[in-house]
């Protein structure tokens, strides 16, 4: 491990042939001989879109690119594809040239002959179209319209820009149509007026007068007896019904008072009478179930806990249990719970008596 100063600088054995490499300090650099790209400075003009387009449009035909590392050095590069707008402009120019050439050729085509030659050709065409077949006689009136038709056709064929001229036949047809339309329309209008005015008036007058009178008479005749009969029926029906209702209303409060008195008497005696057809929920009273209170019974044939303790602690428990088992099938009713209980003061008095007797005997 030594410093950089101790190492001797190695020089290449062969001299460098490239004159660009001799300027570079380090010949081992892979980019030796390629000029460095300039660094952009703040004051330098930046590339705007216009300058970029100009650079794209300017495509050199034979670009001079020299790169010693390139495998295709000395081979000319393929030209870049031109932009779209340039291609469209070229297409438009080519199409315009083609269409202009076609227009010029079509305009000069049909009008090949000019002057007296064109007039002679027109006459020959007219004669060939209007010439009648052999052995037939043709009137002068029939020839004239055919000649006019042929002339108009030739004019249209020779000069396509000329407007169509109305033929006399078309004019005649138009005049006939005008003449036909006017009298027919007038006659139809007059017929309609004649039909509408007298018929409508007569029909309305005839329909309105007798029918309206008959209807009014019928209504007057129908209204009078029907109204009278209805009024009589109402008067007859109202009188008995009103009497019946009054009597019922008088009877109802008496019955209600009697029922109230009877219910009060039943409540006083304590007898609860249930109304038929009415549930307690419909009357608004809750149906509360009253469970019967069960009598508290001891676990073993009515013996109290104190009695159980006394019997268990006594010496002759077995005999008592046996006697209880034997006597259990007898028909005597079991004593109630309260009767079996031995009260505390009675028990103490019995013990005092025994102690007193024991003391007397000892003395």
Swiss-Prot record:
Localization:
Cytoplasm, Cytosol
Give start-end positions of Low complexity composition bias: 296-308
According to the UniProt record, one GO cellular component term is: cytosol
Protein's GO biological process: cell division; protein ubiquitination
Coiled-coil residues: none
Q: Bias regions of kind Acidic residues — which residues?
A: 192-210
- Composition bias (Basic and acidic residues) maps to 137-152
Keyword check for Transit peptide, yes or no: no
The answer on whether this UniProt entry bears the keyword Cell cycle reads yes
Annotated spans, Disordered: 1-81, 126-152, 191-210, 231-363
Where does motif KEN box map? 353-355
Associated pathway? Protein modification; protein ubiquitination
Q: How is it modified after translation?
A: Phosphorylated.
According to the UniProt entry, which residue ranges have a biased composition of type Polar residues? 1-12, 259-285, 311-321
* Keyword terms, alphabetized: Cell cycle, Cell division, Cytoplasm, Mitosis, Phosphoprotein, Ubl conjugation, Ubl conjugation pathway
Q: What does this protein do?
A: F-box-like protein which is required for entry into mitosis. Acts by participating in E3 ligase complexes that mediate the ubiquitination and degradation of WEE1 kinase at G2/M phase.
Query: Can you state the subunit structure given in the record?
Result: Interacts with wee1, when wee1 is phosphorylated at 'Ser-38'.
Could you give the domain comment from the record? Answer: The KEN box is required for the association with the APC/C-Cdh1 complex.
* Entry protein name: Cell division cycle-associated protein 3
Organism from which the protein derives? Xenopus laevis (African clawed frog)
- State which gene encodes it: cdca3
